[in-house]
Regions:
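Short alpha-helical transmembrane segments in multi-pass integral membrane proteins
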Residues: 1-18, 76-141, 185-240, 297-363, ...
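Short runs within selected transmembrane alpha-helices of multi-pass transporters and secretion channels
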Residues: 69, 137-156, 167-175, 193-206, ...
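Helix-terminus/linker motif at the lipid-water interface of multi-pass membrane proteins
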Residues: 30-49, 118-125, 181-188, 250-281, ...
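N-terminal transmembrane alpha-helices
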Residues: 6-43, 56-71, 75, 100-107, ...
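Transmembrane alpha-helix boundary and packing residues in multipass membrane permease domains
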Residues: 21, 25, 37, 41, ...
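Small-residue-rich hydrophobic transmembrane alpha-helices
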Residues: 48-108, 145-164, 271-335, 367-389
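Transmembrane helical elements of multi-pass membrane transporters/channels
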Residues: 16-35, 137, 171, 200-204, ...
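Alpha-helical transmembrane segments and their lipid-water interface positions
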Residues: 28, 32-39, 62-69, 73, ...
Length: 443
């Protein structure tokens, strides 16, 4: 049965529609975890620490893709809901071209700033050298990474979430296969890990670009773009919450790494790296669900179908509550096994990782509501509220927690910081839902 964003959704149809986006994000997190697994177990703890130290800095430059993807897809989906298909294609083309240009400029800027960024996180010696080398290697494919993130959002808007999944799987299999080839067979070490990621991102960015350039069966087509400064500004402001979320997550990760080096040494950074790999896998479910439902919300808002908007909102809260309970329980119980996969070769590091992950696991209980809340308001084209939620949960609350809690609890305070921040953000999100329900008619 064909399902697109204009359909009426029961739970079965909703799950079927968002499943490709959820699986896609899980798969992305899986091959990201594969990078960590190969580097940690076959290149060494120093390289693993370096990768985790510099990766947040790389993501600062890549975040423009999330902004253009989420903000642009919301605007295009709303335009489609209003029945203006030709305008939707022109906007889509302008957004893709702008994202590519931004990725190229940021790649060049990042190359020159990389040594300063690594040094600012208190890296020194071999860790510093490895961080700069790995960071500059990954910047070679930054424009393609940006495009990949943009197309992930637009595949859903175009009514082709399953195609986005297939392209992601192709990209992921490429990365895992090349990791094994370059690291295990060719013995290229950190260079091999970086090149595997670069080639994977080129595959993930070029294939959807070619698809939309050719005649296709989706709802969208790349055409000659027409400059529309106001629409581009709307895309950037509407997607600013996702930009803020991802930039802030990167800067907060840098702050975590700085605190951990000061309190627990390089083992703390390595343990935090393991926790982040696994957390991304768990949070990928929330990200994929939010990404999958956002075009549905935007379409129904644009088409003024309040009854369907209310239905999607209520169903989503139920799904997120059940998922949060399941993920929190699973994370707590599986912590020893997950730590052993990445750092089983070092008993002290594994013990530190298990303790940290069990404190961290409580954040999954409420994190889904915060993520969905931000994405929901973006889909309603209210970038301001979405940005406030993102800024508070990802920056303000976490910075306060990671600075204050270690003063009383030491390293445990660092592990608890995310959970405390998500609890505070949950109350903010619920407050906005209650305050805006009459304006948008979703409750």
């Amino acid at each position: 049965m064909h399902t697109d964003i204009s359909s009426r959704f029961n739970y079965e149809r909703l799950f079927r529609f968002v499943l490709p986006s959820v699986v896609m994000m899980i798969f992305i997190s899986t091959y990201t975890m594969a990078d960590g697994f190969f580097v940690s177990n076959y290149v060494g703890k120093t390289a693993f620490t370096a990768v985790n130290l510099i990766f947040p800095a790389i993501m600062v430059f890549a975040c423009v893709g999330f902004m253009f993807g989420s903000g642009g897809s919301a605007l295009v989906a709303k335009t489609m809901g209003e029945g203006q298909m030709e305008k939707a294609n022109r906007l889509f083309s302008l957004i893709v071209l702008s994202a590519l240009a931004g990725g190229i400029l940021l790649s060049a800027l990042g190359y020159f700033l990389m040594p300063f960024l690594a040094a600012s996180m208190d890296a020194s010696g071999e860790v510093l050298a490895c961080s700069v080398f790995y960071g500059r290697t990954l910047l070679l494919s930054l424009p393609m990474f940006v495009l990949q993130r943009v197309f992930q959002s637009f595949m859903v808007t175009a009514g082709k979430p399953s195609l986005g999944l297939r392209m992601t799987i192709l990209s992921g299999v490429t990365n895992i296969g090349l990791d094994a080839l370059f690291i295990l067979v060719f013995k290229w070490g950190l260079l091999g890990a970086g090149l595997a990621t670069v080639l994977c991102e080129y595959a993930g960015g070029l294939f959807p670009l070619i698809y939309f350039l050719k005649r296709n069966t989706s709802s969208l087509q790349l055409v000659n773009p027409e400059w529309d400064g106001s629409a581009l500004w709307k895309t950037c402001t509407n997607g600013s919450s996702e930009l803020l979320t991802n930039i802030s997550m990167s800067f907060v990760s840098m702050l975590y790494n700085y605190q951990l080096i000061s309190i627990a040494g390089t083992d703390g950074v390595a343990a935090f790296g393991v926790i982040m790999y696994v957390a991304f896998f768990f949070e990928a479910i929330y990200i994929g669900y939010s990404m999958g439902t956002a075009p549905i919300v935007s379409y129904n808002y644009g088409a003024r179908r309040d009854d369907e908007l209310r239905s999607i909102f209520r169903k989503s809260l139920t799904v997120i509550a059940g998922t949060g309970l399941f993920l929190t329980t699973s994370a707590y119980l599986a912590a020893p096994v997950l730590a052993d996969i990445f750092v089983g070769y070092d008993e002290t590091l594994a013990t530190l990782t298990v303790r940290g992950f069990r404190f961290f696991s409580f954040s999954f209980l409420l994190n889904g509501f915060c993520m969905y809340g931000s994405a929901f308001f973006t889909a309603l084209n209210n970038g301001f509220i979405s940005s406030v939620i993102s800024l508070l949960q990802s920056v303000v609350f976490q910075i306060i927690a990671v600075i204050a809690l270690p003063l009383w609890l030491g390293t445990d305070g660092i592990w608890l910081s995310v959970s405390i921040a998500k609890l505070l953000a949950f109350f903010v999100t619920v407050s906005f839902w209650i305050a805006c329900r009459k304006e948008y008619h979703y409750a």
